[in-house]
Amino acid sequence: MKSVLMIGQSNMAGRGFINEVPMICNERIQMLRNGKWQMMTEPINYDRPISGVSLAGSFAAMWCMENKEEQIGLIPCAEGGSSIDDWSIEKILFKNAIIQAKFAMQNSNLIAILWHQGENDSYNGNYKTYYEKLHTIFETLKNELNLDDVPFIIGGLGDYLGKIGFGFNCTEYDLVNKELLRYANDHNHVYFVTAQGLSANPDGIHLNAVSQRKFGVRYYYAYKNKKNVITPLKNE
């Protein structure tokens, strides 16, 4: 079995409304829950009662389309509302991700780490230290999990931010995006995925279900082709 680690905040965990998109039903897509692999159902990353559709579902579905005989397992460790500081290597979210990944790796081969985080750091100039903090997280993950060329796929923040609802104060989202892209360009096996053109729920901060499906396809494209996705894909 192959496996994928999901880390970040609520748009990685997923807040898309489940009734807005067709169900992904595939016995070859598993998720880690209570220490056991079980068939994927959404929400995959149940961190809140409002958890819903995540980009990881369509990422895994795309992977299965091109790997006909294998299984893929999702390791959900994202936490809604978490800042980059909440993912510091001495704190519980990072430690939990390491524990869950090591447990999953006992009977799976980790092939990718999916990261989406930054809404909680898109104000008050927090982008200025984002690059260095992200580097510490990723380098420590690599060392702790003995990862050499496993890709880190990092998603950008939506251009709907800074306008309404809970996203109103996220006025520096574009500056965070620039740091994410700069990090991907500076490091091997790190690929940036744009959120350009994606849409939010009425709350103004969380990607809706259709956009989560599209985002997962973009993440997979970056993973498969080992390159940044800086514009929306055709026919996604």
Residue ranges and their predicted role:
Residues 1-236:
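Cell-envelope and extracellular/periplasmic
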